[in-house]
Amino acid sequence: MKKTKIVSTLGPASDDIETITKLAEAGANVFRFNFSHGNHEEHLARMNMVREVEKKTGKLLGIALDTKGAEIRTTDQEGGKFTINTGDEIRVSMDATKAGNKDMIHVTYPGLFDDTHVGGTVLIDDGAVGLTIKAKDEEKRELVCEAQNTGVIGSKKGVNAPGVEIRLPGITEKDTDDIRFGLKHGINFIFASFVRKAQDVLDIRALCEEANASYVKIFPKIESQEGIDNIDEILQVSDGLMVARGDMGVEIPFINVPFVQKTLIKKCNALGKPVITATQMLDSMQENPRPTRAEVTDVANAVLDGTDATMLSGESANGLYPVQSVQAMHDIDVRTEKELDTRNTLALQRFEEYKGSNVTEAIGESVVRTAQELGVKTIIAATSSGYTARMISKYRPDATIVALTFDEKIQHSLGIVWGVEPVLAKKPSNTDEMFEEAARVAKEHGFVKDGDLVIIVAGVPFGQSGTTNLMKLQIIGNQLAQGLGVGTGSVIGKAVVANSAEEANAKVHEGDILVAKTTDKDYMPAIKKASGMIVEASGLTSHAAVVGVSLGIPVVVGVADATSKIADGSTLTVDARRGAIYQGEVSNL
């Protein structure tokens, strides 16, 4: 089962129910809607398709709105584009009403003149063309520049000024309209472009609260040096983070991007906040059916770094192979997770310097350690807000984390968290009911089977957010009976119900479990072949108890109506330490 989540961008290449269904079946968990392109009508049509696919497939699918953000672009160019050569002089004007040419281009942000300095650099089209600022014409408010390289400058291309604090607004009027539209139509996540400071996130959160949609999770995209410098304060007010390597690689030296990625991921992991690694992960698959070896390595390293999700942009939105791109990313994620399984101890140690003092986080770490020690494959976390599941996920357990939640909105918000399988359940009224519901739902969804040992995490008083304080080890399945155990061992075998010594001696074979009302010396031929005994007669000095200790086999005595409750020939597990008899095979006792 894949634990790393996949964010898949929708676009012209994935614009029908059949393709979106294939993307979901290939492993996409969250669908990204890029509001830098398209209109509300187009996006709503795709959102409706995602919800239809969710109902059709039964898979939990999230919807993420990616804002256009406050960005600087060139205006249109005369003739659409032109070529500039190394050493050419060109001016950059702040007049956004005019078209550009090889002598002068115009940009959409008038403050660029004030924010930049002589000797600085202006990059066009993700760095395809670099301009060095030679002088500033104060009278005309134009930057006098020299081309660093030969290249093409086109219409409406992105403009960056590396290392410069740009005083653009956190969210634009378009962003506000787009976010309100998304909130109205049930989005689950907002990916906020060009976030530079905490206030940018708070402005978006205010829009969510205004729409009574505080459940929508906000993931700022860190794309500039200013955002990197302010990362700690940004994370404090955010629900997660996107490492957006595209503009980041233009705004800061590209050689620093891998190390910034690792730092940002580690900070998110330590706080238990999900992080997405994005941009050009399988970029060549826009045109080719297979990724390059470098791309495979890039995705794998992001997973090893600790990313919660890996993202596809143009690969699934505009490329020739959208489904194959998701499938390739799925396969890389799953293969890499096998390596993570062997590194769990490192995951448990890596947050020593970040340890908090709250109970939920302490229990999260304890749960993962316990699961690792006992070989538990499923952790069931009852969570009202999703916090408990995230605090367990941060330690990257080998076990699957089943998040039992009672709100569909919280369920969808957990769909992007590493290793978490969010399941909607009816809200129980007390802790005992919760344990029963947790076992039932996990079994119903195929996460566990009878006999599995699971860890259930919850809070008392039940149902209140932030009260996680309870961890319980529980065996899934039917406990048939209870008695007094003799010894400390456990055994699995076929039940042989015998009402007399003669019947027992005739029916019991090597390794069977003898079930009888009582025993005496006449039962010894059968007892010597048995791997365990269940007896209705009680007492630690009874024949069965004494013989069991002598032979070193598990025995449970004082089991009322054992010969009538237990079916002859059925498979049983006898746990002498607990004095319990279970239907079927139970491991990890």
Swiss-Prot record:
Q: Where does ATP bind?
A: 34-37, 73, 157
Which transformation does this protein catalyse, written as a reaction? pyruvate + ATP = phosphoenolpyruvate + ADP + H(+)
Q: Which PANTHER family match?
A: PYRUVATE KINASE
**How does its record describe regulation of its activity?**
Strongly activated by glucose-6-phosphate, ribose-5-phosphate and fructose-6-phosphate. Weak activator AMP and weak inhibitor fructose-1,6-bisphosphate can act as strong inhibitors in the presence of strong activators.
* Pfam families per the UniProt record, alphabetical: PEP-utilizers (PF00391), PK (PF00224), PK_C (PF02887)
| Keyword annotations of the record | Allosteric enzyme, ATP-binding, Glycolysis, Kinase, Magnesium, Metal-binding, Nucleotide-binding, Potassium, Pyruvate, Transferase
Entry annotated with the keyword ATP-binding? yes
Query: What's the name of the protein?
Result: Pyruvate kinase
Q: From which source organism is this entry?
A: Lactobacillus delbrueckii subsp. bulgaricus
Family assignment from sequence similarity: Belongs to the pyruvate kinase family.
